[in-house]
Structures are given as C-alpha cells and as structure tokens.
Design a protein with these regions (language model features):
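Intrinsically disordered, low-complexity, charged terminal extensions of DNA damage-control enzymes
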Residues: 1-34
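Alpha-helical ds-nucleic-acid-binding substructure associated with the helix-hairpin-helix region
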Residues: 3, 12-13, 19, 44-121
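Alpha-helical scaffold segments that form or flank carboxylate-/histidine-based iron centers
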Residues: 31-45
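Buried hydrophobic packing segments
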Residues: 39, 88-91, 131, 153
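Catalytic DNA-binding helix-loop module of base-excision-repair DNA glycosylases/AP lyases
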Residues: 43, 109-155
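Charged catalytic carboxylate motif
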Residues: 87, 148, 180
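A basic, often C-terminal nucleic-acid-binding module that engages the phosphate backbone, implemented
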Residues: 156-180
Length: 180
C-alpha cells in the first residue's frame, strides 16, 4: 500500500487541498515484485481490454508467474501472442541474468532506471515509471510526457496545469512526494 504514506498525505493536504479532497482516503494496491510488475505490464499492453482474462490465464498456466516458470513455458507462451511471449521471455532472461534487478535499479537515478527498463521489449516509459513508483517506492517520479498524469491534473486543476510551466510548478510544489 505505497507510496501513499502518512507523510505524503500530510504534505499533499498542506500544499494542495483540492487534490487531497479529490484523492480522499484512497488506498492503492501496488505490485511489489519486479518481475510480476513487468509481466503484468507486458500482458496488459498485449491484451488491453482482455487483460484480466489474459493475466488469469497466464497465472493458471504457469502456477506462479516467475522468471523461472516463464522460461520453462518457453514457446507455449505464444498462445498469448508472439510479441507478448517474446517480451515475457526477454524480461525473464533479463531478471535472471541480473541485467534488470531491484538492487541495480534502486542504485540508478530515475531517468537511468527508466532507460534500463525501457530497453526491454514492450516496456514503455509509462510502465517503467509505474515500476519505479510501485516496486521501487520512488516517491517523486512525475513526468510531463505522461498523458494520464496531465489528464488528471487538468480534471482537478484546469487546463493551465497541463502546460509545461503549470506542470513544473505542480511538480515543485508537491516535491518530494509528487508520485503520491
């Protein structure tokens, strides 16, 4: 249940009561396992609206969604689509080889960690940022190029918040808990 910690909520209430009211007492369930977060993001990208079914099917087939089980399944994963299968296999190999790992990512600045994650097939900036926030618990990862963030800002604060200047002002005001 992170990164929405008590200090983050307290900061949000003090600097942005309008957003605090919109968020309310929301609690967000975030994936804590790196590979599971990668796999969910990859399957979600490949299955889109059918994600819940596709994820349940993958979990049922593998028993446990882990890099080892993905590699064991190998070509059978093509039932989920060739692109998704290649992406899952690549992510599994990267995690098992240490190319992508919690310790390595935790040691990198946000932009570099995003770059490492985006080097994997089917991992885009938005998924990489979700992993930084959810798995690595980075409390202040906000990007102007994230349309979902800008859309939410516009709903709460109006169109001016979506300009580069408005976004940067928002980000500065909410630091160090911008992700919350």
């Amino acid at each position: 249940m992170a990164p929405l910690t008590d200090p983050a909520f307290a900061r949000l209430r003090s600097v942005d009561p309008v957003l605090a009211e919109a968020v309310g007492d929301a609690v967000f369930e975030l994936e804590t396992d790196l590979f599971t977060a990668l796999a969910k993001g990859i399957v979600e990208k490949g299955a889109s609206d059918a994600f819940p079914f596709a994820w349940a099917s993958l979990a049922a087939r593998l028993g446990e969604v882990s890099p080892e089980r993905v590699l064991e399944a190998g070509p059978a994963l093509e039932d989920f689509g060739k692109k998704t299968a290649k992406a899952l296999l690549g992510a599994a190999k990267a995690v098992l080889s240490g190319k992508i790992g919690m310790e390595r990512l935790a040691a990198l600045p946000d932009d570099e960690a995003v770059g490492v994650l985006c080097s994997l097939r089917c991992v885009d900036v938005r998924l990489a940022v979700r992993i930084l926030i959810g798995v690595l618990r980075r409390p202040d990862v906000l990007r102007f190029d994230d349309e979902a963030v800008r859309s939410g800002l516009m709903r709460v604060h109006g169109p001016r918040s979506c300009t580069r200047e408005g976004f940067e002002a928002f980000r500065a005001r909410h630091a160090p808990f911008g992700s919350a």
